[in-house]
């Protein structure tokens, strides 16, 4: 889609340029009340990276002294303030003036604009034409004040600061390189697009901005200029920061703990374990008010919107239909996600021309007016017309977050990072080993954080993570609370809403409400059996315990990334498949870069596709937003983990091709990599290849003994080969077990008659020279599991050789009977290579015995596999055995137990518009067998995948919905009969008609 004259944004010169202009207008409006001089009148600056003074301080200086502060580099930016630039920027430098922040300080000191040339960091000068220096840099060495000299720090502070210096720049890179396009959950479909891109701008001097994802520069431009994704990645960044602090600290002590001696406990601590949950109060608002103290006490909201009249008269595309879009979103929230609050939010704030920007954070004064985080700005202004809005301050968030973590790390590193402003801390060692009064320490810590950051925080302390988080809710705002044995935990938890507990979302909450369970008190009064029936065994047990204040989860100090993803649901407007493929190639490169940077490889590749819903308007209420969409997930599991961009790109393109979606219907694309493995792990086959190479080199170095060659010439290239497999037997044709038994019986009869005639018994054996010989040196170098497999393979050949020796030549080999059922195999062993590994585990022995029994059972051929004319050709003495086999019942093939069950279900659903009753009965029998075999996890996997592909059918598929619900109901009835509880299926049929 190209931008035309009637799209509502042409008069601004584009959406991104409008955002830039909005930020400049905000800055100008905020500067007027505080302006003291016009020293920097007509001068604009843009801060690139870390500087001294900081970006916030430079912004305040420009605000007070008449200058302009650009949030993004623009063509008319006067100076770019920086301390250091990467090499790529230096080599690609244009005519921009990169100067030191010292220039601003010196201008203030002299109260005039000084020459910028001495403060230039880099220039485009050449050795043949050096730059002319018109002035000398000012020597400021004598003007340093004593207050600028920091006092000496103790050892612990130096260690934390050194790690921070090493990590902060890396974390800045992590926050940029681990960019996750803010993943829009289904609950946020109605509003997340605009909030993602409001901070987006361009650095192009011309109006050649990348307007849609079809533009080759769109993806790089989005990630280069949009900083809102930092919110989603700050948590991951600080989890890595805590890991690095722990690794660097090792077994060293904490000198800062010496200051806690004054906090000695006068009485015995009442809990065996102390867990603290610390959370900053209204984090975004608190950081923003540090530079806006005049706004304290007023209702404040952090958002991209200006507020005021600008938030109630937003331009809307002429072809957009807000009313239709509103109703579609509301229906989905109510019927699919069972979230009435979200539906009400859409209905009350998704009308007219009101701003759909979301409020990221609001002050407690605003909350008293009914405003909540995530609310639309237009809706909030209806509740509170005097609401003040402030912009994001990402550098400030990072600065305060580092200070918070560094302060806690001076006392303990038993930290579980949750986000940039929230963490769990284990205080048991401080309480018992140092005999410290826990609440006195918490008060001391909170005061230290406030003195360093100017931002308040609250803390809750209890015996586990769940109660500690609950205690924090009691402590807010700016307080602390201890939930110990003196409190009646059951009475405290009883009125708590169930959606406050971990793992309880809108879907689980809806099921609980249907069962008459609205709060923790209701669960306390019910039985464990009922909870397991409603939610399944595992989740039912967890919720049953949590409602009683029981939580055994330990703190996760070193958290390993389990997924890496990159997603884009703004500006996805393709006109052909070529544009779509080009964008997917770029997105694959982006997600691969993130994967490499965390030193991981992925085995599972998932492609998330957002397709415009059939009933949704083509143009969305939000410019270039995704609107109401159907979400399709396609996944592929590759053989080996990879971080190769070519492999990932190929898989992604294949998945997109399989989806077969028209390009103009796409509204969002995302790549998610899972099943991550350590990139430093080397695959076993590589080690084996290397071992064979070393053995070959060793053989070359060994002298050949005289006479070892025999009659062969010295030049024969087969002499020095380390392994000789020339006599390796050819692969045998698959033989039916019945034919082998028949031939063996005939051979035994012949041998018996021959022995009786001769009176002697001499075993008839096959020459074992045809069995491959093993090199003992090579065998000794093999890993244990491979060596056992090779030995077992050789023993198998020996057994075959002995068996062939008993074959009677007077009876030809009988032909194998035809197999009527292609799913039944007779000569495939269920044992894997790893099963040959010796194990002392009783469970392992039991598994091997069970597999052995299954293997023996599979050798039987059922009656439906035997053809009548084949039976007639058999000798008479074999017929009784065949008749005995015929009397055995026929076993159903296990269609859903293989690795290809997804392909089977996918083909079935895609090929049939209406499921046949016989097929449904077959699937039901398969699932029932799995339940009887206690394969409940596989039942859940099968039902989850089947439900997903049914939901993906865009045509009328209510017949499939009925079939699925029929099988689901049968499964639950069988589970209640056998196990006494029901299974929890996280996927469900999303159909308003069926509902």
Swiss-Prot record:
Q: Where is this region: Disordered?
A: 135-164, 182-211
Where does this protein have compositionally biased stretches of type Basic and acidic residues? 136-164
Q: How is the cofactor bound?
A: Binds 2 magnesium ions.
Q: Binding residues for Mg(2+), per the UniProt record?
A: 279, 421
- Gene Ontology biological process terms from the UniProt entry: DNA synthesis involved in double-strand break repair via homologous recombination; double-strand break repair; error-free translesion synthesis; error-prone translesion synthesis; regulation of double-strand break repair via homologous recombination; translesion synthesis
The answer to whether the entry has keyword DNA damage is: yes
Low complexity composition-biased segments: 192-211
**EC number, as in UniProt:** 2.7.7.-
Q: Which Pfam families match?
A: BRCT_2, IMS, IMS_C, IMS_HHH_1, REV1_C
Q: According to its record, what are the GO cellular component terms?
A: nucleus; replication fork
Q: Where in the cell?
A: Nucleus
Top-level taxon: Eukaryota
Query: Which cofactors is this protein said to need?
Result: Mg(2+)
Protein residues bound to dCTP: 361-367, 373, 421
The molecular function terms in GO held by this entry are: damaged DNA binding; deoxycytidyl transferase activity; DNA-directed DNA polymerase activity; metal ion binding
Q: How does it assemble?
A: Interacts (via C-terminus) with PolH/DNApol-eta (via C-terminal regions). Interacts (via C-terminus) with PolI.
The protein's name is DNA repair protein Rev1
Gene name of the encoded protein: Rev1
């Amino acid at each position: 889609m190209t931008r035309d004259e009637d799209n509502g944004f042409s008069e601004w010169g584009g959406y991104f340029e409008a955002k830039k202009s909005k930020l400049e207008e905000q800055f100008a409006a905020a500067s007027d009340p505080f302006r003291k001089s016009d020293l920097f009148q007509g001068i604009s600056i843009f801060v690139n990276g870390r500087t001294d003074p900081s970006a916030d301080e430079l912004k305040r200086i420009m605000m007070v002294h008449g200058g302009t502060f650009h949030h993004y580099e623009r063509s008319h930016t006067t100076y770019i303030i920086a301390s250091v630039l990467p090499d790529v920027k230096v080599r690609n430098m244009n005519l921009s003036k990169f100067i030191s922040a010292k220039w601003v300080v010196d201008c203030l000191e002299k109260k005039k604009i000084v020459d910028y040339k001495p403060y230039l960091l880099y220039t485009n000068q050449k050795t043949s034409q050096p730059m002319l220096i018109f002035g000398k840099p000012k020597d400021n060495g004598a003007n340093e004040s004593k207050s600028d000299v920091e006092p000496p720090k103790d050892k612990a502070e130096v260690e934390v600061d050194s790690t921070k210096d090493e990590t902060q720049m890396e974390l800045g890179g992590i926050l940029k390189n681990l960019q996750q396009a803010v993943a829009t959950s289904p609950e946020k479909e109605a509003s997340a697009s605009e909030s993602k891109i409001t901070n987006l701008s361009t650095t192009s001097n011309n109006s050649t901005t990348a307007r849609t994802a079809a533009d080759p520069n769109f993806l790089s431009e989005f990630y280069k200029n949009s900083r809102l994704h930092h919110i989603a990645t700050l948590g991951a960044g600080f989890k890595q920061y805590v890991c690095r602090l722990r690794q660097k600290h090792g077994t060293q002590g904490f000198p800062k703990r010496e200051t806690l001696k004054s906090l000695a406990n006068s009485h015995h601590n009442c809990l065996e374990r102390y867990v603290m949950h610390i959370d900053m109060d209204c984090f975004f608002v608190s950081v923003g008010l540090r530079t806006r103290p005049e706004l304290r006490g007023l209702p404040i909201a952090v958002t991209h919107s200006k507020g005021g009249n600008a938030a109630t008269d937003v331009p809307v595309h002429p072809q957009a239909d807000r009313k239709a879009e509103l109703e579609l979103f509301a229906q989905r929230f109510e019927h699919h996600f069972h979230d009435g609050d979200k539906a009400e939010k859409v209905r009350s704030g998704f009308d007219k021309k009101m701003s759909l920007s979301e409020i990221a954070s609001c002050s407690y004064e605003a909350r008293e007016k009914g405003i909540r985080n995530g609310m639309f700005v237009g809706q909030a202004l209806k509740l509170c017309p005097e609401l003040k809005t402030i912009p994001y301050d990402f550098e400030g968030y990072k600065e305060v977050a580092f200070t918070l973590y560094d302060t806690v790390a001076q006392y303990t590193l038993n930290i579980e990072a949750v986000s940039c402003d929230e963490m769990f801390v284990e205080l048991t060692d401080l309480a018992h080993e140092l005999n410290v009064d826990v609440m006195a320490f918490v008060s001391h810590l909170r005061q230290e954080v406030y003195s360093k950051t100017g931002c308040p925080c609250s803390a809750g302390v209890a015996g586990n993570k769940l109660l500690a988080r609950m205690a924090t809710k009691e402590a807010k705002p700016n307080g602390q609370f201890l939930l110990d044995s003196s409190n009646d935990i059951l009475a405290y938890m009883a009125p708590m809403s169930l959606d406050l507990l971990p793992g309880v979302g809108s879907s689980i909450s809806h099921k609980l409400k249907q069962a008459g369970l609205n709060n923790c008190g209701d669960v306390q009064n019910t039985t464990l059996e009922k909870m397991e029936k409603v939610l399944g065994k595992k989740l039912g047990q967890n919720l049953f315990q949590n409602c009683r204040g029981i939580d055994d989860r330990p703190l996760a100090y070193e958290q390993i990334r389990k997924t890496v993803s990159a997603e884009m649901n703004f500006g996805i407007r393709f006109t052909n498949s070529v544009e779509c493929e080009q964008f997917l190639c770029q997105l694959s490169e982006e997600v691969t870069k993130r994967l490499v940077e965390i030193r991981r490889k992925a085995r599972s590749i998932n492609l998330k596709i957002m397709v415009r819903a059939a009933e949704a308007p083509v143009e969305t209420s939000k410019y270039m937003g995704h609107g109401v969409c159907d979400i399709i997930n396609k996944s592929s599991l590759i053989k080996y983990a990879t971080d190769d961009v070519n492999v990932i790109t190929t898989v992604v393109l294949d998945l997109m091709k399989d989806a077969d979606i028209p390009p103009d219907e796409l509204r969002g694309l995302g790549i998610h990599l899972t099943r991550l493995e350590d990139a430093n792990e080397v695959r076993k086959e590589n080690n084996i290849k290397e071992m064979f190479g070393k053995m070959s080199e060793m053989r070359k170095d060994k002298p050949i003994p005289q006479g070892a060659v025999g009659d062969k010439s010295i030049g024969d290239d087969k002499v020095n080969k380390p392994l000789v497999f020339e006599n390796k037997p050819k692969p045998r044709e698959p033989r039916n077990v019945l034919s082998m038994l028949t031939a063996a019986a005939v051979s035994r009869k012949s041998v018996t008659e021959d022995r009786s005639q001769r009176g002697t018994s001499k075993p008839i054996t096959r020459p074992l020279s045809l069995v491959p010989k093993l090199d003992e040196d090579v065998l000794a170098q093999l890993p244990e599991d491979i060596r056992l497999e090779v030995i077992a393979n050789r023993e198998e050949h020996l057994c075959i050789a002995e068996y062939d020796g008993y074959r009677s030549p007077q009876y030809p080999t009988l032909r194998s009977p035809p197999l009527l059922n292609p799913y039944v195999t007779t000569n495939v062993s269920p044992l894997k290579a790893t099963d040959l590994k010796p194990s002392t585990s009783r469970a392992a022995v039991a598994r091997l015995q069970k597999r052995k029994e299954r293997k023996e059972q599979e050798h039987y051929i059922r009656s439906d596999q035997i053809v009548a004319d084949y039976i007639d050709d058999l000798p008479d003495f074999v017929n009784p055995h065949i008749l005995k086999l015929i009397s055995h019942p026929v076993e159903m093939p296990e269609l859903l137990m293989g690795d290809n069950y997804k392909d089977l279900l996918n083909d079935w659903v895609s090929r049939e518009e209406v499921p046949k009753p016989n097929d449904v009965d077959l699937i039901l029998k398969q699932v029932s067998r799995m339940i009887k075999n206690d394969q409940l996890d596989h039942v859940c996997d099968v039902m989850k995948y089947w439900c997903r592909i049914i939901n993906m059918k865009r045509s009328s598929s209510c017949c499939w919905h009925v079939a699925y619900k029929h099988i689901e109901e049968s499964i639950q009835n069988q589970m209640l009969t056998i196990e006494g509880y029901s299974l929890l299926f996280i996927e469900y049929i999303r159909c308003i008609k069926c509902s």
